[in-house]
């Protein structure tokens, strides 16, 4: 899979989770990308990258767990190899994995049925009103699409922002 996270909000973590190889094009200023990958359980993945900003620099490789203190300081491309990639979507995430706050989450079993009925595709754009955990899981299922999460309460919006950050999502817009 090839993703370019310089132009549109793309989710690196779910893409790496579900593909054996992911080529990521990125720009400077992403300070915690490797920490986020490691935090999502992808520390054993191997990263192949060019050392430095010149195209003729040496190609190096390291495991994500050895790069958690590094960031991206130049436009770059990197190949991430995940030998444990899954080829199915994960739905029905347990409520214990979501950040707590003012939100009452629907049960994971009910959420799994709702998401199954929605038949979300990778490039879908979806609007979710007052369904925080559904918005998060939809964003994971549609890493190349956009999820608009409508939250009426300021405290619910804050919790939603925490969950977006916690899951490393770039394709959620909260209004």
Regions found by a protein language model. Give the residues of each.
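Class I SAM-dependent methyltransferase SAM-binding "motif I" and its flanking Rossmann-like core
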Residues: 1-18
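A contiguous loop/helix-start segment that scaffolds small-molecule binding in enzyme catalytic cores
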Residues: 17-101
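Phosphate-coordination loops involved in phosphoryl transfer and adenosine-cofactor binding
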Residues: 19, 122-123, 144
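The conserved SAM/SAH-binding core of class I Rossmann-like methyltransferase domains
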Residues: 50, 129, 148-151
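Conserved alpha-helix/loop element of class I SAM-dependent methyltransferases that forms part
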Residues: 107-122
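Conserved class I S-adenosyl-L-methionine
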Residues: 123-132
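Conserved SAM-binding loop of SAM-dependent methyltransferases across substrates and taxa
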Residues: 132-144
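S-adenosyl-L-methionine
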Residues: 150-175
